[in-house]
């Protein structure tokens, strides 16, 4: 072989090798790029699915007919914000056995199907089908210490959570220290009054709940003294209360095991000493969870009028974090508890789940 022929063969081999390496690198870059796009789409779709499931799950208890439409609406909004088109998006309400139902559903399932476009691999396939699904479950929880014998006017909660726009921060579990006013605090106020005065002066009043160590249910009437009230605040009521799902304007018969569990008795009058001592005990316990107290949100038709002791309905529950750096002190006829509302999920879901209906729920993603 002549030197000239050898050199030509060598140059040809180098050219083939260079082209081969270039094609391999191009294919690798293309696959990496398309795989990154695929992961981005799938993560965004999963987030949209989870968002829809949690949003729909919030309605399973109070308005089950709207659970699936709400889940779809929230999932669709997330998909649009991420500029992702979907081929199919559907939510279904299920019972405990994962069978579709609209009667007392316990779960909501969301499925999303979409085609993820390819770029470098478009010559092979224009898009890749991707499917995600998720399921949120309505789960009763065991409270850390039970409900506190304090009732809050539901309208005061609604003003704070909805009118002032604080509900998303509460649902997300955003710490109070990371919030901006007015969502970073909510003062509970009680007028120091005699038992004959109107109940609930301020936005809150004392409730007569079953005290620790007591036996027997007392949904309609639990007469307690100041010391019993303080012990109940410190330890939580051992009785399980629920809430009036229909939010009826009059005393309801919404029951738990045959008892009117949504009914609670007011305790007229406010005594400053037990309030201060009870908050001090919760703050000084050494357990951060003891700073979280669960309040009953009461039918505003009764918290706005009436005197003495009477029966009213619980319309809901809210977890409240005590501000232990700013504890209650006696004032001019008023005692104030400082703190703010926090999420059940982040702070109050302690203990094991139970099939016993406590009326207090959290929404959990289980798939």
Describe each region flagged by the PLM:
Residues 65-72, 90-107, 120-122, 126-367:
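N-linked glycosylation sequons
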Residues 1-3, 11, 34, 81, ...:
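Low-complexity, intrinsically disordered short peptide segments enriched in small/polar/basic residues
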Residues 76-89:
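Short secondary-structure junctions
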Residues 4-5, 24-27, 34, 99, ...:
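Generic structural signal for short, flexible, solvent-exposed coil/loop and linker residues
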Residues 2-73, 295:
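Alpha-helical assembly-interface signal, strongest on the long, hydrophobic N-terminal helix that forms
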């Amino acid at each position: 072989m002549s030197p000239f022929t050898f050199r030509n063969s060598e140059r040809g081999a180098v050219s083939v090798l260079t082209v081969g390496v270039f094609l391999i690198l191009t294919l690798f870059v293309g696959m990496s790029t398309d795989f990154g796009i695929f992961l981005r789409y799938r993560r965004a779709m999963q987030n949209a699915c989870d968002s829809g499931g949690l949003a729909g799950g919030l309605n399973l208890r109070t308005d089950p007919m709207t659970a699936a439409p709400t889940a779809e609406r929230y999932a669709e909004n997330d998909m649009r914000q991420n500029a992702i088109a979907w081929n199919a998006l559907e939510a279904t309400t299920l019972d405990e056995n994962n069978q579709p139902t609209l009667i007392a559903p316990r779960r909501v399932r969301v499925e999303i199907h979409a085609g993820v476009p390819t770029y470098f691999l478009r010559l092979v396939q224009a898009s890749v089908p991707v499917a995600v699904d998720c399921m949120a479950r309505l789960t009763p929880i065991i409270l850390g210490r039970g409900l506190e014998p304090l009732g809050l006017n539901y309208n005061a909660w609604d003003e704070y959570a909805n009118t002032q726009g604080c509900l998303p921060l509460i649902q997300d579990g955003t710490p109070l220290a990371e919030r901006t006013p007015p969502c970073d605090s909510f003062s509970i106020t009680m007028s120091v009054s005699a038992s004959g005065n109107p109940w609930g002066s301020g936005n809150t009043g004392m409730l007569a709940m079953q005290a620790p160590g007591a036996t027997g249910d007392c949904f309609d009437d639990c007469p307690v003294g100041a010391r019993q009230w303080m012990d109940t605040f410190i330890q939580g009521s051992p009785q399980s209360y629920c809430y009036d799902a229909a939010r009826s304007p009059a005393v309801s018969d919404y029951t738990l095991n045959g008892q009117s569990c949504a009914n609670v008795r007011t305790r007229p009058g406010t005594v400053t000493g037990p309030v201060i001592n009870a908050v001090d005990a919760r703050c000084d316990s050494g357990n951060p969870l003891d700073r979280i107290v669960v309040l009953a949100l009461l039918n505003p038709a009764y918290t706005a009028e009436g005197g003495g002791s009477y029966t009213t309905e619980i319309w809901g529950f809210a977890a409240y974090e005590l501000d232990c750096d700013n504890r209650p002190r006696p004032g001019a006829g008023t005692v104030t508890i400082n703190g703010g509302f926090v999420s059940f999920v982040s702070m109050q879901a302690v203990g094991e789940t139970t099939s016993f209906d406590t009326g207090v729920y959290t929404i959990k993603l289980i798939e």
